[in-house]
Amino acid sequence: KEDPWERLRKLKAGLPNTRLQMLLRGQNLLGYRHYSDDVVRAFVAKAAVNGIDVFRIFDAMNDVRNLRVSIEAVKAAGKHAQGTIAYTTSPVHTVEAFVKQAKAMQAMGIDSIAIKDMAGLLTPYATADLVRALKAEVDLPVFIHSHDTAGMGSMCQLKAIEAGADHIDTAISSFAWG
């Protein structure tokens, strides 16, 4: 039976100069149900000790209340807490709402912000507008992670760079399309 902590330690040993990152679903950790605060704190501490450096923390409903304990735990472990906006579209999911969310996460002590376009819904100009607004309103590095579901991922990345994004996520094509 595989031990994920052992695998993580081996990765860290083999990549000593690479910051390892994980996606953390806030109060849901790695799944789809809420866990108690003590379980969240213990999991984050264990992940940090075993080699995770950057925790990309999000809530699928963009409810920042579900991020607080994870952010506190990451900071207590001395690691990088990346607050994450789960991008989607609706009448209430506006640039202004996402900026408000980013400011709330900044007040919680995050180190950077990620725009997580998990469904590939971002369009190039929406990307530029959102990145520009975040850079103007929040004094933190902005990362973008997009999926190419609608074939616009690379253009969104370009527009993010042009609008001032600090980092973009990329993938090796032989792995990304497989």
What are these language model-derived features?
Residues 118-178:
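Catalytic alpha/beta core domains of metabolic enzymes, predominantly
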Residues 1-106, 110-112, 120-124:
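Active-site beta->alpha loop and helix N-cap motifs at the rims of alpha/beta catalytic domains
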